[in-house]
A protein has these predicted regions:
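A residue-level marker of the well-folded mature domains of exported/periplasmic proteins
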Residues: 1-199
């Protein structure tokens, strides 16, 4: 049995949250290695942003790696200094560098001026803690797109219990059957309302 996740659906919601949060009308997407799976994250994110405001600029860059954290840091640095204030990363270990860059940058800013990162595959909020220049304990993870692997395991074991083990089938998990989701993390009430509506 194999499972596929409709990552573009949770990425779309991340795009809505980003578009409702950006102060610069400029956001970014960093992918690992271009493939159908990662492109689905990118396109979903872009569509979500566009649904809120088609004039928001979305920078897109691929690292050509899933492990090069240094590359992630360099790309994030260029995007942030180019005016993007939120980056969604779907890039494995490359994403670690994006978090590092956001932390370094945010420690030089007042809390109100922080830049954001959107987490991927699991809730990454705990990786976004920092102390701002004006001495505030804060967090820069706006939201996280989730693969709800636990729900999939539950679903397959329930099917098995009912003698309906889906051997050889490809099971598709999306927002409707709770296979993917968006963790709210630090999304504002207004932005979260837009996410709920977009669902």
């Amino acid at each position: 049995v194999s499972a596929t996740f409709a990552d573009q659906e949770s990425a779309y919601l991340a795009g809505v949250a980003a578009a409702k949060t950006t102060k610069t009308d400029h956001v970014g997407f960093i992918g690992g290695i271009a493939s159908d799976i990662i492109t689905a994250f990118q396109v979903g994110f872009q569509e979500g942003v566009k649904s809120v405001n088609p004039n928001i600029k979305v920078d897109v860059q691929y690292a050509g790696s899933f492990s090069d954290a240094g590359k992630g840091k360099t790309i994030a640095s260029a995007m942030y200094s180019g005016g993007a204030d939120i980056i969604y990363q779907a890039a494995g270990g490359v994403g670690t560098g994006v978090f590092t860059e956001a932390r370094v940058l945010n420690e030089t800013k007042n809390e109100a001026d922080k830049v954001w990162v959107i987490g991927v595959d699991r809730d990454q909020e705990s990786e976004g803690d920092f102390k701002s220049k004006d001495g505030k304990e804060s967090n820069f993870v706006l939201a996280s797109t989730l693969k709800e692997v636990g729900n999939v395991v539950k679903d397959v074991s329930n099917k098995t219990k009912d003698n309906k083990f889906p051997g050889g089938e490809i099971l598709k998990y999306d927002l409707k059957n709770s296979g993917v989701a968006l963790a709210r993390n630090n999304t504002s009430d207004e932005a979260w309302k837009a996410v709920e509506t977009a669902k």
